[in-house]
């Protein structure tokens, strides 16, 4: 079998709820190289974070934990690996393992997710364009 490791399972910290349309990044920030962190995209994509917040509250979890748990629930061969350099982030990430979903919940979330019109090019897509 082949495993699948999703790129950026916590969206470069976006699900940490510390960015919004007023966020500005230093010239050295990795966020400057990603379309989805432009002010316009952050404003438009707020609906995704709002949806993650609603569901994370339902699951008594953080949006980051919800994001990781949802990815884990998709298929047994999907293995999200969030990069972290801080112990408290690792502990938060591990909390995703305690979250479960019913098939009905997964279907409901998927329908809500598909109704959101996201802005910005995904990181790997912009990398491919440079080739």
Feature roles, as predicted:
Residues 1-28, 62:
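Aromatic-lined glycan-binding groove of carbohydrate-active enzymes
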Residues 4-6, 80-83:
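Hydrophobic faces of well-ordered beta-strands that scaffold small-molecule active sites
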Residues 14, 89-92:
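Phosphate- and divalent-cation-binding pockets in alpha/beta enzyme and binding domains
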Residues 22, 81, 121-122:
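Short, hydrophobic secondary-structure boundary micro-motifs
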Residues 27-54, 58, 73-77, 91-131:
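Terminal-tail/helix-coil boundary detector
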Residues 47, 61, 85:
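Residue-level signal for the nucleotide or nucleotide-sugar donor/cofactor binding architecture
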Residues 66:
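Glycine/threonine-rich phosphate-binding loop and adjacent beta-strand/alpha-helix elements that clamp
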Residues 69-70:
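Hydrophobic, secondary-structure "cap" segments at the distal end of domains
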């Amino acid at each position: 079998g082949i495993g699948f490791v999703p790129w950026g399972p916590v969206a470069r910290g976006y699900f940490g709820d510390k960015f919004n349309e007023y966020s500005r990044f230093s010239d050295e920030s990795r966020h400057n190289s990603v379309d989805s962190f432009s002010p316009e995209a952050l404003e438009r994509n707020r609906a995704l974070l709002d949806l993650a917040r609603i569901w994370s509250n339902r699951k008594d979890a953080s949006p980051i934990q919800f994001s990781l748990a949802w990815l884990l629930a998709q298929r047994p061969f999907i293995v999200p690996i969030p990069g972290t350099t801080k112990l408290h982030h690792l502990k938060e990430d591990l909390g995703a393992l305690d979250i479960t979903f019913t098939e009905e919940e997964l279907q409901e979330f998927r329908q809500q997710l598909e109704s959101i019109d996201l802005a910005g090019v995904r990181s790997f897509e912009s990398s491919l364009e440079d080739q």
